[in-house]
């Protein structure tokens, strides 16, 4: 059976990164380097920023450096209660420009000029802001202690009044995880990560219901999974050993289980495992030696295992993870 529903075109203009609020009543989007909120019931548009300008100010969408180096474009996020929107602002006014010829349908090429910092040149100046929808007011997060830095990740936690941000120095060997009060915009460092070479920025940060969080780190010489409380105190190391966690698949809160891929059965092999958040009851979900990779269903009950080896072409199998049986 199916239900037929009507699709409604909301805008007669192009928008970037339209994102529903958690309560489904609003849509945040970017247009012309500014941020807006569309209320579905009233069809009203509320403008969050007004200073957006090409090759000068970008609000809520990343610049070239962030898109290429940190692999994300949408630089805004809804709070869990749909009352606030946090966003990153990029001031690229002082960034050097690069021009290139664009060969379109015309007889002659046109010139496109955009901001492009090369090594050693000025990056965009970034700042973090929290917009309160009911008050139509914005607060800037004080990051004055940092100099020439990146806001490599930004997301609200499960607590609707706590925003997280990962601030990375330009050398990329020192990262602070910040928790920011949604009302005052006051920030505190809850975790620091240093590395002699560089700190790898990932999307592995996972918040639990009590706002404790899962974090991956190479601090013991190997990439492993850790559990911290909501204040950034280490509760326990989930995985350990002289091997690498090569992919973190996620956490199932119902079964209190973490899923990951690692090199536990040999550095040239990849196997898929589940483990309790306590670090106990580890199980191998893949049973063939070679390269295994998993894609899990949203509830982690099923997964597609992709397997290959020197003697086996890529093979896909649908499996039960057995965690809810």
Predicted regions and their residues:
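Beta-strand C-termini and the immediately following turn/loop, strongest in propeller blades
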Residues: 27-34, 39, 74-77, 86-92, ...
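A short loop-to-beta-strand structural motif that recurs across blades of beta-propeller domains
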Residues: 34-36, 127-129, 176-178, 224-226, ...
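Short loop/turn segments that connect beta-strands within beta-propeller blades
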Residues: 40-43, 133-136, 182-183, 229-231, ...
């Amino acid at each position: 059976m199916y239900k037929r529903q009507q699709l409604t075109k909301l805008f007669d203009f192009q928008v970037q990164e339209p994102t529903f609020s958690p309560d489904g009543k609003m849509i945040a989007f970017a247009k012309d380097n500014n941020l807006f909120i569309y209320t579905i019931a009233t069809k009203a548009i509320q403008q969050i920023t007004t200073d957006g300008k090409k090759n000068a100010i970008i609000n809520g969408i990343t610049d070239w450096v962030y898109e290429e180096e940190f692999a994300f474009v949408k630089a805004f996020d809804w709070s869990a209660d749909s009352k606030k929107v946090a966003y990153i602002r990029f001031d690229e006014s002082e960034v050097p420009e690069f021009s290139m010829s664009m060969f379109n349908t015309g007889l002659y090429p046109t010139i496109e000029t955009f901001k492009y910092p090369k090594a050693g040149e000025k990056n965009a100046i970034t700042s973090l802001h929290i917009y309160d929808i009911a008050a139509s007011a914005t607060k800037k997060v004080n990051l004055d202690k940092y100099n020439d830095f990146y806001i490599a990740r930004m997301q609200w936690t499960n607590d609707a009044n706590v925003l997280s941000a990962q601030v990375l120095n330009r050398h990329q060997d020192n990262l602070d995880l910040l928790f920011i009060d949604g009302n005052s915009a006051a920030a505190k460092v809850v975790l620091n990560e240093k590395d002699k070479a560089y700190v790898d920025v990932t999307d592995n940060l996972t918040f639990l219901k009590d706002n404790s969080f899962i974090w991956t780190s190479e601090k013991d010489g190997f990439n492993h999974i850790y559990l911290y409380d909501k204040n950034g105190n280490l509760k326990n190391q989930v995985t350990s050993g002289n091997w690498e966690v090569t992919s973190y698949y996620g956490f199932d809160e119902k079964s209190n289980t973490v899923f990951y891929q690692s090199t536990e059965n040999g550095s040239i092999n990849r196997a898929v495992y589940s483990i309790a958040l306590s670090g106990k009851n580890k199980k191998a979900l893949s049973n063939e030696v070679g390269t295994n990779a998993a894609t899990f269903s949203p509830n982690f009950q099923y997964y597609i295992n992709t397997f290959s080896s020197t003697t086996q072409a890529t093979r896909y199998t649908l499996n039960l993870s057995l965690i809810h049986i």
